[in-house]
């Protein structure tokens, strides 16, 4: 049975620059589909069209009748004063309405009205089937899985950060228990435990799932088919992300081989036609014209597009000591909340250290203490004399977002004009894009720009706080390779 049918969708925001250009595909009931594509390929636009938030210029979307569809990135507006608990419980509004009607009817059952009794039976069956008797159990289970603690549930929803709102909305969406889930970057604001929990939830979910994600490990564990948006249309891969990556490269090499074969044939035919024209006989000219028509048909095949990759590497400063960093008995608290106590750590040249912990455990705070941006309450932090730190923060900010990318490299990265162009080009900022203001960049583009500023610095100690947040799949693969080579 088909849950979603997309037929010849077209959408453009600027005349002559289509985002979707005849997009056609279908999703069967129970499928787990990854929606992939470069930044700007139209993935989020597609989701917004599926949910009715935007209208396509033409084409149609057909959803299976009666199926409910939920989108994680769609954060509704709630009444002023709503707490996290209130927002989560809106998932049960329909069940609560049924419960209220059941109570109302039960007070009238003594009348012996058969129609009323039949209505009560139907409502009770629907209430039970919808999980009405399991509301509290489901709420506690999902909050535990996504790390939403009891005290956090008392906070005002309006006061939460964008990431926190997204996590609460994910929990609410799961509680609603829709038949079709649309997940747009669901792991961006989840810690490791919550991500593992979400993977397990999806594996047991009985409905249909469409996922946009730049986390290839998450994709490998949650999807069984890929729809890639490319030039406004769909390309299909019957497997998870690992299959997609291998198959995409195989297709590219096969298309390139075919293209080169055709170009060689065009060259041979062109030379044959040229010689025939030189003889300038009626018979040979006719044959030459026939060959030239054949060449025109062959010339319609475009060279397959090679995937652009980032090419920069971290600059490396010399280091003349064993200890880059030492922490001894470091502790930190905010009021009565102790983040960590008696932290002792020694970092030596060549170490690769992962800092793990639940959301709120103090990972970013510890990094800020190491960098001198946050004072510790006790203990000592010492850096080696020749340490040169390269730091990528979790929240990317620029001191002058009104500046263009080009000017940012000139004034904040100390580049001359040619260096600015060259370094931006290595990070796939080319042509007129370098004159866009930083303020209009997407989260992924801002991360790339910050990395561009960082990469040519001579550093010997990298501190990366959630470095893959907002980066696309290619950029994530690149940063892994760059760190491995550092």
Please give the residue ranges for each predicted region.
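Short N-terminal helix-initiation segments at or just after the protein's N-terminus
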Residues: 9-11, 271-275
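Generic structural signal for secondary-structure transition and capping sites
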Residues: 207, 278, 300-303, 460
């Amino acid at each position: 049975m088909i849950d979603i049918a997309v037929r010849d969708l077209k959408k453009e925001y600027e005349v002559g620059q289509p985002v979707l250009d005849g997009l056609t595909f279908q999703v069967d009931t129970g499928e787990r589909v990854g929606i992939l594509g470069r930044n700007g390929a139209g993935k989020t636009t597609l989701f917004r069209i599926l949910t009715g938030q935007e209208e396509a210029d033409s084409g149609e979307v057909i959803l299976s009748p009666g199926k409910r569809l939920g989108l994680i990135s769609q954060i509704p507006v709630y009444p002023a004063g709503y707490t996290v608990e209130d927002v989560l419980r809106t998932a049960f509004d329909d069940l609560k309405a049924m419960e209220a009607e059941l109570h109302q009817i039960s007070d009238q059952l003594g009348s012996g009205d058969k129609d009323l009794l039949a209505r009560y039976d139907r409502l009770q069956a629907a209430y039970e089937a919808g999980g009405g008797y399991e509301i509290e159990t489901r709420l506690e289970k999902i909050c535990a899985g996504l790390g939403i603690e009891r005290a956090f549930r008392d906070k005002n929803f309006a006061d939460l950060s964008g990431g926190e709102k997204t996590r609460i909305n994910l929990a609410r969406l799961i509680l609603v228990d829709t038949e079709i889930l649309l997940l747009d970057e669901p792991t961006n604001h989840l810690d490791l435990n919550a991500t593992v929990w979400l993977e397990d939830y999806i594996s047991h979910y009985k409905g249909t799932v469409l996922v946009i994600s730049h986390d290839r490990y998450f994709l490998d564990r949650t999807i069984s088919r890929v729809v890639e948006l490319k030039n406004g249309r769909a390309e299909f891969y019957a497997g998870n992300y690992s299959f997609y990556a291998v198959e995409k490269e195989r297709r590219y090499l096969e298309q390139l081989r075919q293209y080169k074969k055709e170009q060689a044939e065009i060259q041979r035919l062109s030379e044959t036609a040229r010689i025939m024209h030189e003889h300038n006989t009626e018979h040979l000219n006719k044959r030459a014209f026939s060959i030239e028509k054949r060449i025109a048909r062959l010339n319609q095949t475009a060279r397959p597009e090679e995937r652009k990759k980032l090419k920069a590497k971290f600059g490396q400063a010399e280091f003349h000591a064993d200890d880059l960093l030492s922490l001894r008995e470091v502790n930190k608290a905010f009021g009565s909340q102790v983040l960590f106590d008696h932290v002792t750590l020694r970092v030596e040249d060549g170490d690769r250290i992962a800092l793990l912990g639940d959301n709120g455990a103090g990972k970013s705070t510890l990094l800020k203490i190491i960098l001198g941006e946050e004072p510790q309450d006790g203990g000592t932090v010492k850096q080696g004399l020749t340490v040169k730190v390269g730091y990528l923060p979790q929240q990317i900010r620029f001191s002058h977002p009104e500046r263009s990318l080009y000017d940012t490299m000139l004034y904040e990265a100390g580049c001359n004009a040619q260096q600015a162009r060259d370094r931006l080009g290595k990070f796939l900022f080319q042509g007129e894009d370098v004159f866009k203001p930083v303020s209009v960049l997407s989260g992924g583009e801002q991360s790339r720009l910050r990395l561009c500023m960082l990469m040519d610095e001579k550093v010997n100690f990298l501190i990366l706080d959630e470095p893959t947040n907002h980066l696309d799949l290619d950029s994530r693969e690149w940063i892994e390779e760059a760190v491995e080579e550092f």
